[in-house]
């Protein structure tokens, strides 16, 4: 079977991508160093030596720029779930999509910001009410999109069968706990993230069905 190599982007597309990434990098640096509310669009544009008008060609506003790194991770994860082998059970597909997707995701993120800067941006989102509200809205939309992917994989009517939404809700809760533990720890390595993810997913069954007291 022949494989085709995707065409390389043209110079125009490469320049647009470079400008987008430079604006995003500048925005993240400013948000994490002086705060989201204190940072203006003009400051972000000036840091890259472009006009405010150019900024708005790439982002609808500060909020979109602040959540852009998160958007990259979410988009990659949804596509990762969609690409999992059909024989995998739903929870296993979710598990493998996140565990196997971290390498390529890390490369995409680190081309813009270091893992440490990414973690700092995550803290800014959690501590800024307007960003946290937007983050929660996006999280709900993402869970719905992933549940729909699972329903399609399993041939289910998502409106009649609650299992896709239940599975994604449980998985999402595990990932939120994992991310919070990761960003508050001292080890920002991918191996630590994988280890935490695997450990917490392994604990879902016992946590839901077993007793928690010592000796039970």
What function would you assign to each model-found segment?
Residues 23, 61-66, 76-77:
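Short amphipathic alpha-helical segment with a characteristic S/N-K-E followed by hydrophobic residues
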Residues 1-34, 38-50, 67:
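Basic, helix-initiating cap at the start of DNA-binding domains
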Residues 51-59:
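Short hydrophobic/aromatic patch on the recognition helix
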Residues 128, 140-167:
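Hydrophobic alpha-helical bundle segments that form small-molecule/ligand-binding pockets
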Residues 1-4, 148, 152, 180-216:
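C-terminal peripheral helix-coil segments that are non-catalytic and often amphipathic
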Residues 68, 75-121:
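Hydrophobic alpha-helical connector segments
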Residues 19, 73, 98, 138-142, ...:
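Hydrophobic/aromatic residues within well-ordered alpha-helical segments
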Residues 136, 156-201:
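Hydrophobic/aromatic-rich alpha-helical bundle segments in the mid-to-C-terminal region
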